[in-house]
Amino acid sequence: MTSRLALFDQTLSASLLQRVNSDPHDYKAYKTRVKLKILEQRGEHGEKELKFEISRADDFEFLFAAILNNEKYQELAKAHELTVDFDTFPKVIIQHLLCKNIVKTADEDGIEVDARAKPGYHSIIENRGVPPTEINIKLEKDKNSCEFEIFSKTPISKGKIFAMSLQAVRGDLLIAHLLKICSSQSTKIATLHRSTDELAALKTKVAEMEKRNQSIEDLEKKIEEQEERIREMEDELELVKEERENIRVIAEEKEDLVAELQNDLESVNRELEENQEELEIVGKMLGEEQGKVDQLQKRNVAHQKELATLQRNFQKVESQLKRSSVEQSQQSLDIRKLRELEADLKEKDSMVENLTQTVGILKKELEDERVKMQETMTSFESLKVENESVKERLAMYRNQRFSPAPVGLQTTTIPSAGVGFKTVLGQNSPYANNPNMRTPFRDTSSALNTGLTYQNSITPLPNTTRFLMADDTTGSSVTNTPPVLRNPL
């Protein structure tokens, strides 16, 4: 034998029939996998031979072989009525008979693959038009030989295509076969050892990768937290920008409000000038009504009591201001205002003393001049006291026009202009019923309506209240004190 050519080397699905007794028809059958090799070789005289060899992976001693030359094939073809020649026979059985029974086997790496997909077996062509076949292997009881049979199967029958006898391989050939299997198993074991080492290395790498992945996950969480913090800081920055914009808008509104207050101050100054003119007119009218001052003497005592009440109210307000000054940041300004109020009170006390002295002088003059002169001087003193009351009422009227009274303090209701005018001048005064003399006072109802409109249109602010509290020409809305008469008659 000079050379060998492997025509077929695949694992087939077959039925193994093993005789259990001497009865030639009594077999024990079970499914198994056998490996079939078809080798093309040259004999001793150079003739072409086909070697059929079957083996099993689960039974190393299961090895049967048969050599088929042209002469033996002719006997086989005659016995089974084969229609192909010796050269075509292997190709036909491989492509049309054996291909239906090829099964997947595990390669050297332990992965199952279809042998038909391996390179080098291009001659295996699966013909879908060929009916399925069945392979039977009849094993003799002594296991020295077996019968290799191929059947064609139809839905209703099964027919034998051919059968050939294979002899058990023993001796050196079996030893060589076993050595080949051992070598293959050793190679697989070495491969498994390498795979085990690689698996251990991979496990170590996997553990390292898991640690890295865990650290990466921690970093990702930290990054997410940082991103969330950045978003929160951006939101806070937007809020700060909005607050700055709101502060700017409020500052502009405050500037506009200050400008409006300045305009209001100018208008108040103009009204004060007008009120001064009105006071001058009232002074002239009071001079003409000196004869009626005797009726006002009795009111002096009542006004003295009212002054004492005002002083008590002033003391209460002073104590309240002291308590509130501790809580306010502008303590120095409140103290200065308190001093101004004290100065106003002293000035008003001096006015009361002056009025009292004037009353005494008038009493002396009334004693010198007879009963009429005495009544005139008494009326004159009473008229002066009533003048202060009128000024106080005018101041209270201004306070009610320009700003509301502070919380907790009582306000004095302004009497109607007509009633107060008649009370001061008397029923027998030539100016009492003269409509022309009412012009300097302006219409009381319109003034009240104007004051209400002005009060509703302008919201009083603390600065406005402080201005009115500190203005000694209009009096104080806190202590309910009358205004200071700059040019007393």
From Swiss-Prot:
Pfam family, any one: SAS-6_N
Protein source organism: Caenorhabditis briggsae
Residue ranges annotated for the PISA domain, each copy included: 45-97
Coiled coil: 187-409
Domain of life: Eukaryota
Lineage: Eukaryota, Metazoa, Ecdysozoa, Nematoda, Chromadorea
GO biological process, alphabetically ordered: centriole replication; protein localization; regulation of cell cycle
UniProt main location, coarse: cytoplasm
Protein name (Swiss-Prot/TrEMBL): Spindle assembly abnormal protein 6
Ranges annotated as biased composition (Polar residues): 473-482
Record text about domains: The coiled coil domain is necessary and sufficient for interaction with sas-5.
Disulfide bonds: none
Complex formation: Nine homodimers form a cartwheel structure with an internal diameter of 23 nM and radial spokes connecting to the microtubule triplets. Interacts with sas-5.
Renumbered residue ranges of the record's region Disordered: 470-489
Function noted in UniProt: Central scaffolding component of the centrioles ensuring their 9-fold symmetry. Required for centrosome biogenesis and duplication.
GO CC annotation terms, alphabetical: centriole; centrosome; cytoplasm
UniProt keyword list: Cell cycle, Coiled coil, Cytoplasm, Cytoskeleton, Developmental protein
Subcellular location: Cytoplasm; Cytoplasm, Cytoskeleton, Microtubule organizing center, Centrosome, Centriole
Keyword Coiled coil: yes
GO molecular function: identical protein binding; protein domain specific binding
